[in-house]
Design a protein with these regions (language model features):
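SAM-dependent methyltransferase catalytic region
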Residues: 1-140
Length: 140
């Protein structure tokens, strides 16, 4: 299961799934973090605060989650280091993004290749389209 999930998360072209023309980039100032840098950041977090990944109850929130590159790697690391299930990892992983198409791509990405109805409910609750600066972070 984990290998299929990793493949689903990692084998995507950079910034895939969303049409990003020059005008959109100019209007939204969107910048997407490449996978190599995401992995570097996650490794640094794991080195400095390993409990973030060994305790599956620890919460992660990305206030500009984009297409889920960072959240997907957080989920992989939680599963690898804590032994939790995908459902448990998703239950404590949250994301906010201003752009609806990014939110939809993030949801598709982090649910994995074969999402169950239960995973869809969790992800629909935990990944929301909103302004990360003004959102109340209740995830209701």
């Amino acid at each position: 299961m984990l290998n299929n999930y990793k493949e689903h998360i990692r084998n995507r072209p950079y910034m895939s799934g969303v049409d990003r023309d020059k005008l959109r980039v100019k209007q939204t100032a969107e910048v997407f973090t490449p996978q190599w840098l995401v992995l570097e950041k996650i490794d640094k977090l794991d080195e400095e605060e390993p409990i973030l990944f060994t305790d599956h109850t620890k919460t992660f929130i990305d206030n500009s989650c984009g297409d889920g590159e960072f959240l997907g790697e957080v989920i992989i690391r939680k599963i690898e280091r804590s032994g939790c299930s995908l459902e448990q990892a998703l239950s404590t992983t949250y994301g906010v993004d201003l752009m609806e198409d990014n939110v939809e791509e993030c949801k598709k990405r982090i649910m994995g290749p074969n999402p169950t109805p239960e995973l869809r409910v969790i992800v629909d609750r935990n990944i929301v389209c909103h302004d990360g600066l003004t959102y109340d972070y209740k995830f209701e």
